[in-house]
Amino acid sequence: MRISIFGLGYVGAVCAGCLTARGHEVIGVDVSSTKIDLINQGKSPIVEPGLEALLQQGIANGRLRGTTDFAEAIRASDVSMICVGTPSKKNGDLGLEYIESVCREIGYVLRDTTRRHTIVVRSTVLPGTVKNVVIPILEDCSGKKAGVDFGVAVNPEFLRESTAIKDYDQPPMTVIGELDSASGDILQALYEELDAPIIRKPIEVAEMIKYTCNVWHATKVTFANEIGNIAKAVGVDGREVMDVVCQDKVLNLSQYYMRPGFAFGGSCLPKDVRALTYRAASLDVRAPLLDSLMRSNESQVQNAFELIEAHDKRKVALLGLSFKAGTDDLRESPLVELAERLIGKGYQLDIYDENVQYARVHGANKDYIESKIPHVSSLLNANLQQVIDNADIIVLGNRDEQFRALALQAPAGKQVIDLVGFMNKPTSTTARTEGICW
């Protein structure tokens, strides 16, 4: 494949070396004549183990060359990869001036070409950037239509400095965000020899995946550091703690708890977060990430309330009251907190929870229900169908399988608010569904 790479910094130079090593013809493009001279001499413009050998090989076999001539590189290639930097502005926003400049250059050249060209954004950009910035510039400068006259895709990179060659050759996954299937097909062909799953998604999803991965990595580092600081303050080696924590691949390092949805609750998590952050504060150990957990959890309850409030209807069915399905435990259930807010704002609320109904009469939580939340428990209704029929808004609060079946057959005319991820789309033309995070 003939590929032009715009930007010969860290990402661009690594991609150039790895692509030529796999037999592709690559033209490296940069405004810096110094970088171009280095590339054409087979020298790496960055420090990265193994890269210079790949560049030397590419120059020697004629598959790699560098140029400052944007137009010539575009005309001589079928795919253009944008790998320019996206530096932070003073306010923290993303600087897109380099991407905008490259897109203008590409667009002007496309105006005079008849071959279909595919533009691939490898630079890290926020969701909506390709749709709202890249494509409009390309279309305006070329006079052509994206997805029809030329292709557009996003291909986020997951290269780590000092291990970039290995990361390119052995990725955990290859993410392709495609505007049109033809562009996705081209990138899939480019990467199909790599032993990694190829995941094709809409462009905005691919953009968000990249940021989510990076922020998750930053979160893990910060979490481990804060745990380590608290551990040291209580006379424990934080490394020993985290070594054991990381051995749990069922809960700690897994997909469990990693699905967007409603707030956490129950008798353990809220209590233990508060206890540990209190101890940290008493020892003068700063733990801003851990300190933020309860505030963030509270914010998710408020988000759910605002979803309901936005629909200007007063009859609400809350399906689920315990903090999770399969239990009658109401201690610190975020659904109880949500119910309290709805009651306080004058909503007509009916609640259905099979396990809590049982507990109300027989269970160990009977005293808790009657003493702590009698005003909420009085709204419990044992007739699920009646609860649904009386409501304008149906809130799916926990993952009881009864509610999944209901979600798939949502009554026409009802507004369904899904807090747990049962529904992907409305079940009829008149049923409406909205998820808390989707």
From Swiss-Prot:
Any one GO molecular-function label of the UniProt entry: GDP-mannose 6-dehydrogenase activity
Binding residues annotated for GDP-alpha-D-mannuronate, in chain numbering: 161, 210, 214, 217, 225, 256-257, 259, 262, 265, 324
GO biological process, one term: alginic acid biosynthetic process
UniProt xrefs under Pfam families: UDPG_MGDP_dh, UDPG_MGDP_dh_C, UDPG_MGDP_dh_N
Enzyme class name: oxidoreductase
SUPFAM superfamilies tied to this protein: 6-phosphogluconate dehydrogenase C-terminal domain-like, NAD(P)-binding Rossmann-fold domains, UDP-glucose/GDP-mannose dehydrogenase C-terminal domain
InterPro entries xrefs: 6-PGluconate_DH-like_C_sf, GDPman_DH, NAD(P)-bd_dom_sf, UDP-Glc/GDP-Man, UDP-Glc/GDP-Man_DH_C, UDP-Glc/GDP-Man_DH_C_sf, UDP-Glc/GDP-Man_DH_dimer, UDP-Glc/GDP-Man_DH_N
EC assignment: 1.1.1.132
Keyword vocabulary terms for this entry: Alginate biosynthesis, NAD, Oxidoreductase
Keyword Oxidoreductase: yes
Catalytic activity field: GDP-alpha-D-mannose + 2 NAD(+) + H2O = GDP-alpha-D-mannuronate + 2 NADH + 3 H(+)
Residue numbers binding NAD(+): 10-11, 30, 35, 86, 124, 271, 331
Keyword Oxidoreductase tagged: yes
Pathway where this protein functions: Glycan biosynthesis; alginate biosynthesis
Domain of life: Bacteria
Active site: 268
Family per record: Belongs to the UDP-glucose/GDP-mannose dehydrogenase family.
Function: Catalyzes the oxidation of guanosine diphospho-D-mannose (GDP-D-mannose) to GDP-D-mannuronic acid, a precursor for alginate polymerization. The alginate layer causes a mucoid phenotype and provides a protective barrier against host immune defenses and antibiotics.
PANTHER family reported in the protein's UniProt record: GDP-MANNOSE 6-DEHYDROGENASE, UDP-GLUCOSE 6-DEHYDROGENASE TUAD
Protein name per Swiss-Prot or TrEMBL: GDP-mannose 6-dehydrogenase
